[in-house]
């Protein structure tokens, strides 16, 4: 014995079981699903690599104008000013979520709560 695993048996039996299951459902293969959390981790890695803005520009611009209109009507903004506000806002939110996540981990939780 070389310590390796023994060859698997009943391969034909497993294949028959698979084909009968497919025949029972009418040959419709159910769509592939990832385990819970796998897609979330993949998205976290993707967004941590990227540097682009995550909030859409026009909705953010409307929000800025709405908030500014409470102080003074008919204010005008340079496009670079709105972009600077968006960069700062997203940086603040990312930092806030990082701190929130650390608090959740400290409390032995995974989910962040409001």
From Swiss-Prot:
Q: Give the record's subunit note.
A: The nucleosome is a histone octamer containing two molecules each of H2A, H2B, H3 and H4 assembled in one H3-H4 heterotetramer and two H2A-H2B heterodimers. The octamer wraps approximately 147 bp of DNA.
Its biological purpose is as follows:
Core component of nucleosome. Nucleosomes wrap and compact DNA into chromatin, limiting DNA accessibility to the cellular machineries which require DNA as a template. Histones thereby play a central role in transcription regulation, DNA repair, DNA replication and chromosomal stability. DNA accessibility is regulated via a complex set of post-translational modifications of histones, also called histone code, and nucleosome remodeling.
**Gene Ontology cellular component terms for the protein in this record:** nucleosome; nucleus
Descriptive protein name: Histone H3-3
PROSITE patterns hit by this protein: HISTONE_H3_1 (PS00322), HISTONE_H3_2 (PS00959)
Q: What is its main location?
A: nucleus
Q: Where is the composition biased (Low complexity)?
A: 18-28
Keyword list (alphabetical) reads:
Chromosome, DNA-binding, Nucleosome core, Nucleus
Origin species, per record, is Stylonychia lemnae
Q: Please name one Pfam family that this protein belongs to.
A: Histone
Lineage, top ranks: Eukaryota, Sar, Alveolata, Ciliophora, Intramacronucleata
Q: Which SMART domains match?
A: H3
């Amino acid at each position: 014995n070389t310590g390796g695993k023994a060859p698997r048996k009943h391969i034909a039996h497993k294949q028959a079981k698979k084909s009968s299951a497919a025949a029972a459902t009418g040959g419709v293969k159910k769509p592939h699903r990832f385990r819970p959390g796998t897609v979330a981790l993949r998205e976290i890695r993707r967004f941590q690599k990227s540097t682009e803005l995550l909030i859409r520009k026009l909705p953010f611009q409307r929000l800025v104008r709405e908030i500014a209109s409470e102080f003074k009507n008919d204010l005008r903004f340079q496009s670079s000013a709105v972009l600077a506000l968006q960069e700062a806002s997203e940086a603040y939110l990312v930092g806030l979520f990082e701190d929130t996540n650390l608090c959740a981990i400290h409390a032995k939780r995974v989910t962040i709560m409001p």
